[in-house]
Every structure is written in C-alpha cells, then in structure tokens.
Amino acid sequence: MSKVAYIQVINFNLEGITRDDFMGVADEVAPNFAQLPGLISKAWLSDEANNTYGGVYYWESQEACEEYRSSELYAQALANNPNFTNLSDKGFDVLEGPSQVTHL
C-alpha cells in the first residue's frame, strides 16, 4: 500500500434525492474513483439522521488531490451536482510519525 500523505474530507447534504437514490449512484460511480491517479482509498460516509453524506479520501500527495479537484469527475459528481448542497471540501496534511504509530 502506498503511503498516505494527504487526506481530503468532503461532506454535503442531499436535496431532491433519497438516500437509496444516492446509494444507487454511489455504486455506479465508485469504479471511477477507483481509477483516480494517486488515490489510495476512499471511505464513503453516511449520516442519514442528519442528511449528511460524503467521503474521506486518502491521497499519495496533495498534488494528486488538486488534480482531482480540477477534474471533470469532481465537477460533475460533486461541485455542479444539483442534488448535493452545502458542499464542504477540506484537505489535511498527514502527520507521519504519530500516524505510523496508529497504523496509517
């Protein structure tokens, strides 16, 4: 497994679609995320009670994350998606030493 250097956390609310609709779309687009250069892993998130969804992305580098942020996939799947509101996209450097101790 590649070393995680950067983590991206994305959250949004659903509008105009149900959780089940979202799950269907997520299953369809997941293979597109699996092909992203520099993406080590993505955890898909769901908090149905608070209508909050999103993902935690584990990147090899901040540059790989920035390439995704400027991609057509990001624009279509997230930024310009009318069914996703209150989009939050935050990035974090990984603290290597303590993260290794805790098995990242």
Give the residues covered by each predicted segment:
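A common structural junction motif
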Residues: A75-A79
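Short S/T/G/P-rich N-terminal loop/turn motif that feeds into the first structured element of a domain
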Residues: M1-T52, Q62-S70, N83-L104
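Conserved RNP beta-strands of RNA recognition motif
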Residues: G55-W59
